[in-house]
Regions:
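Catalytic core of pol beta-like nucleotidyltransferases
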Residues: 1-32, 41-46, 57-114
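Short, aliphatic-rich beta-strand segments
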Residues: 49-55
Length: 114
């Protein structure tokens, strides 16, 4: 599995991901963040967003999603990046239903843990 240092990222993208990990893990200590998509594969275009999966032990509800959105929005503005967020409960993500999702297959194949 690749590390963040090995990826073809612009410096502002690298810093944004580092700050995202720090802030999300401060607020949700059990969080796991996985980069996937074109940035993880190394074939991103100029307009590509940064796709991230955030796994959390808590139940996913509107309030939690709003908290994550506030964190990501501030970082997006600061570093001039755009995140594509998927937030899931860790137990659900391990379930057979989640494992049957094409998104899950892609993240398993190309995902990079931050």
């Amino acid at each position: 599995m690749k590390s963040l240092k090995e990826l073809k990222l612009k410096e502002n993208e690298r810093r944004a991901l580092q700050e995202l990990k720090k802030k999300i893990c401060e607020r949700f200590p059990d969080a796991e963040i996985i980069l996937y998509g074109s940035k993880a594969r190394g074939d991103a275009g100029e307009e590509s967003d940064i796709d991230i999966l955030i796994l959390i032990d808590s139940q996913i509800n509107r309030k939690l999603k709003e908290e994550v959105t506030e964190i990501t929005y501030d970082i997006e503005l600061k570093y001039d990046v755009v995140f594509g967020n998927v937030i899931e409960n860790r137990e659900f993500w391990k379930s057979p239903l989640a494992n049957a999702m094409p998104l899950h297959w892609n993240i398993d194949k190309e995902g990079i843990r931050l």
